[in-house]
Amino acid sequence: LTDGSDLFLLDSFKLWAEDVFGWYYFEERSVYEPYKDGHGGRYVKKRIKKRLRKKQYLIVARGAAKSMYGSCIQDFFLNVDTTTTHQIATAPTMKQSEEVLSPIKTAITRSRGPLFKFLTEGSIQNTTGSKAKRQKLVPTKRGIENLLTGSLLEIRPMRIDKLQGLRVKCATVDEWLSGDVAEDPIEAIEQGAAKEQSTTSNNDYLIIATSSEGTVRNGVGDTIKMELMKILKGEYYNPHVSIWWYKLDDIDEVGNPEMWIKANPNIGKTVTYETYQLAVERAENNPSQRNDILAKRFGIPMEGYTYFFTYEETKPHRKQEFWKLPCALGADLSQ
């Protein structure tokens, strides 16, 4: 964990990850194979095992350790997957993107267990001596690099031009409902990741999009949610998308602590009931925070903004006269 303590996998993490890594299908492809003498060739049928899930959308309340889950998935591809992978973590702000990398950096610093001990022994400064004495897993200015496999995990800003054309193996998109992004960053990542899908090797990509419910109504989030809703209702069949959408069904359930687990499956483990109790009290007593709390803590998206006026602001003020007062005008003539 980020504070250096040991990580115990939550049941929800195991469930979400089982949904990603537990389902496979076989695909038959005709592949052209040239003859050994270099003249001519023939088409051969090959069976390829592919992972069913390519994207996972996780909409769950604040404090459910979403970024930690993304971090575990990234760590798996960086250190357990022996192929050379390019991985990215993106979020509306660079600080939020950093949250996915920080637990891995802590794990490198602590170097617990035989694998991390092996990967972190040696020094990154040892550039002239033996390769064996160099550190294999290092946080560098590019991101976190695994020098054994040549894998890289880096941070990218949530902008289309920065996410296009990346042939990523694994990408985590954090808080995609909260950022005011006009275009779809997940679509941009997927277009780049799907580039290498025509070959015979199994190069399945994975995009994990985690977020708490947002209050931004004119962003891309609502469009994505409409698509997810269609998949859930069965109007549109897409087995490659895994959806875990946690929310309260009705606003009346906010006052019932037994129902809170519907919005956050890890309540009592990663976030206390007391925190939720305080949030409910705050929403009741501070109307300006109500929409944000309902969305972020209970998964109920609220329309519009709440404006709070103090008593002084609601009092009618006397009519003002501007007759015969000096006046100033300005114009921008550069256009």
Q: Which residues does each predicted region cover?
A:
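Phosphate/NTP-binding elements of NTP-utilizing enzymes
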Residues: 1-331
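Short acidic, Gly/Ser-rich segments with clustered Asp/Glu that frequently serve as metal-coordination loops
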Residues: 333-335
